[in-house]
Amino acid sequence: MAAFVESARAGAGADEVIQLVSDGVNEYSEKMMEGVVACPRILMPCKVNDDCLRGCKCLSNGYCG
């Protein structure tokens, strides 16, 4: 996120901002293709572990993590 803020201050073009925003998605997709499973940083409400994406579990706060 710090890289995004610094680029925005420097007057980054739309292409640079799109690349910065999409990098996280690309990294997660690549890890899934490699078989490495990590819980994405997406707020998803849950009641049981099955409500969450692969690699996540339902936490006591009612969200996947």
Curated annotation (Swiss-Prot):
Q: List the disulfide bonds.
A: 39-56, 46-58, 52-64
CDD domains reported in the protein's UniProt record: PlantTI
Subcellular locations according to the entry: Secreted
Q: Which residue positions does UniProt flag as site: Reactive bond?
A: 41-42
Q: What is known of its domains?
A: The presence of a 'disulfide through disulfide knot' structurally defines this protein as a knottin.
* GO cellular component: a single term: extracellular region
Q: Lineage of the native species?
A: Eukaryota, Viridiplantae, Streptophyta, Embryophyta, Tracheophyta
| Gene3D superfamilies associated with the record | 4.10.75.20
Q: Would you tell me the protein name for this molecule?
A: Trypsin inhibitor 1
- GO MF, one example: serine-type endopeptidase inhibitor activity
Q: Which SMART domains match?
A: PTI
